[in-house]
Amino acid sequence: DVYKRQLQGLWVFVTMNVVIVINSQSGLSPELTVWDALGAILWTAGFCLEVVADRQKSAFNANPANEGKWIDEGLWSLSRHPNYLGEIMLWSGIALFGVPCFSGMEGLAWVSPIFVYILLTKVSGVPILDRRALEKWGEDAAYLQYRENTPQILPRLVR
């Protein structure tokens, strides 16, 4: 339990490190740059994507007719984990806000969105959920077709 809490603390620190670097800048606030605009756009798009994906999944799961089914409608028809794409976009947008502040060792703050991406796609989020889904629906040909035809994270916008 102690190691688990320490690992979670490290996880939180690495993820929020980009915010710490941005907020620790001294002096007057610099002029807004194109990086700030790009960061705001990416953050907003990621936030909206995550919220819409989570709401769609909640509404799907709240419908008794969908009990025991996987969601393959709305954003979930384009990506098996659109909420995670939103999370990755959100943290990447925050990192873009910091581009003007990153100099020297502060550039290591870019580890934050990379860490979020690796964590969600290789360690905790996607692998765990995909394994559970295979355990639950792995014998269902329709699910296997959905899994084969629907990208994990980045949607295929043209079919």
Language model features with spans:
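Hydrophobic transmembrane alpha-helices
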Residues: 12-56, 61, 65-159
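Extended, charge-rich helix/loop segments that form flexible
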Residues: 9
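Short, small-residue-biased leader/transition segments that mark boundaries at the very start
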Residues: 2-3
